[in-house]
């Protein structure tokens, strides 16, 4: 089994925030692959899907973004899933909007959700990093990630989430390099995107 966890905040007012793109990815995956119903488990909402012979647990922690490790750690302990078989989908300030990169291990780079998961599992889990770009000033970061995607960003966002869901068989099989390659081929990042509060 692999665990696919998405980072986000569970209250409705956060639904379309940049910080919730991990939840968005899991919702699209669940819909595309006819996953089972979401149920309250592991301090989150969990759903299961089997792709080929590979079973996946989809997990949306309901702990608020910065405490996601409590949920992911509980699921990992219950199913005895190793960190390398856990993939966390999250927003990435250090990638341009629409860029997608897989990463194995490493630091949290200021992401408190990743930091929380690291405190439970150690650093050696996989990250599926969805670029949202940086507002340019670190004092604007909180407002930026907790604001909705701009209308100008919706086209690449939809394309990227669809590409992630459409390539999931490769991730389920553990072919992470091929997964990243297929996603970026199907949904190349836009060259120029307006972003930030003025883009809405």
From Swiss-Prot:
<feature type="active site" description="Proton acceptor">
    <location>
        <position position="19"/>
    </location>
</feature>
<comment type="function">
    <text>Hydrolyzes ribosome-free peptidyl-tRNAs (with 1 or more amino acids incorporated), which drop off the ribosome during protein synthesis, or as a result of ribosome stalling.</text>
</comment>
<feature type="binding site">
    <location>
        <position position="14"/>
    </location>
    <ligand>
        <name>tRNA</name>
    </ligand>
</feature>
<dbReference type="InterPro" id="IPR036416">
    <property type="entry name" value="Pept_tRNA_hydro_sf"/>
</dbReference>
<dbReference type="InterPro" id="IPR001328">
    <property type="entry name" value="Pept_tRNA_hydro"/>
</dbReference>
<dbReference type="Pfam" id="PF01195">
    <property type="entry name" value="Pept_tRNA_hydro"/>
</dbReference>
<feature type="binding site">
    <location>
        <position position="66"/>
    </location>
    <ligand>
        <name>tRNA</name>
    </ligand>
</feature>
<feature type="site" description="Discriminates between blocked and unblocked aminoacyl-tRNA">
    <location>
        <position position="9"/>
    </location>
</feature>
<keyword id="KW-0378">Hydrolase</keyword>
<comment type="function">
    <text>Catalyzes the release of premature peptidyl moieties from peptidyl-tRNA molecules trapped in stalled 50S ribosomal subunits, and thus maintains levels of free tRNAs and 50S ribosomes.</text>
</comment>
<comment type="subunit">
    <text>Monomer.</text>
</comment>
<dbReference type="GO" id="GO:0000049">
    <property type="term" value="F:tRNA binding"/>
</dbReference>
<feature type="site" description="Stabilizes the basic form of H active site to accept a proton">
    <location>
        <position position="91"/>
    </location>
</feature>
<feature type="binding site">
    <location>
        <position position="64"/>
    </location>
    <ligand>
        <name>tRNA</name>
    </ligand>
</feature>
<protein>
    <recommendedName>
        <fullName>Peptidyl-tRNA hydrolase</fullName>
        <ecNumber>3.1.1.29</ecNumber>
    </recommendedName>
</protein>
<dbReference type="InterPro" id="IPR018171">
    <property type="entry name" value="Pept_tRNA_hydro_CS"/>
</dbReference>
<feature type="binding site">
    <location>
        <position position="112"/>
    </location>
    <ligand>
        <name>tRNA</name>
    </ligand>
</feature>
<keyword id="KW-0963">Cytoplasm</keyword>
<comment type="similarity">
    <text>Belongs to the PTH family.</text>
</comment>
<dbReference type="GO" id="GO:0006515">
    <property type="term" value="P:protein quality control for misfolded or incompletely synthesized proteins"/>
</dbReference>
<dbReference type="GO" id="GO:0005737">
    <property type="term" value="C:cytoplasm"/>
</dbReference>
<keyword id="KW-0820">tRNA-binding</keyword>
<dbReference type="GO" id="GO:0072344">
    <property type="term" value="P:rescue of stalled ribosome"/>
</dbReference>
<keyword id="KW-0694">RNA-binding</keyword>
<dbReference type="GO" id="GO:0004045">
    <property type="term" value="F:peptidyl-tRNA hydrolase activity"/>
</dbReference>
């Amino acid at each position: 089994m692999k665990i696919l966890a998405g980072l986000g905040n569970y209250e409705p007012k956060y639904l379309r925030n940049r910080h919730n793109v991990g939840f968005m990815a899991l919702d699209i995956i669940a819909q595309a692959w006819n996953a089972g119903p979401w149920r309250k488990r592991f301090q989150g909402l969990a759903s299961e899907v089997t792709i080929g012979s590979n079973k996946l647990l989809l997990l949306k922690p309901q702990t608020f973004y910065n405490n996601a490790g409590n949920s992911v750690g509980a699921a990992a302990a219950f199913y005895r899933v190793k960190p390398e078989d856990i993939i966390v989908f999250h927003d990435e300030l250090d990638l341009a909007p629409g860029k997608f990169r897989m990463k194995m291990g490493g630091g949290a780079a200021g992401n408190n959700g990743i930091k929380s998961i690291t405190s439970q599992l150690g650093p050696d889990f996989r990250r599926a990093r969805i670029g949202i770009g940086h507002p340019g000033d670190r004092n604007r970061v909180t407002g930026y990630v907790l604001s909705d995607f701009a209308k100008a960003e919706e086209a690449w966002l939809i394309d990227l989430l669809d590409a992630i869901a459409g390539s999931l068989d490769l991730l389920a099989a553990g072919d992470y390099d091929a997964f990243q390659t297929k996603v970026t081929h199907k949904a190349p990042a836009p060259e120029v995107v307006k972003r930030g509060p003025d883009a809405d």
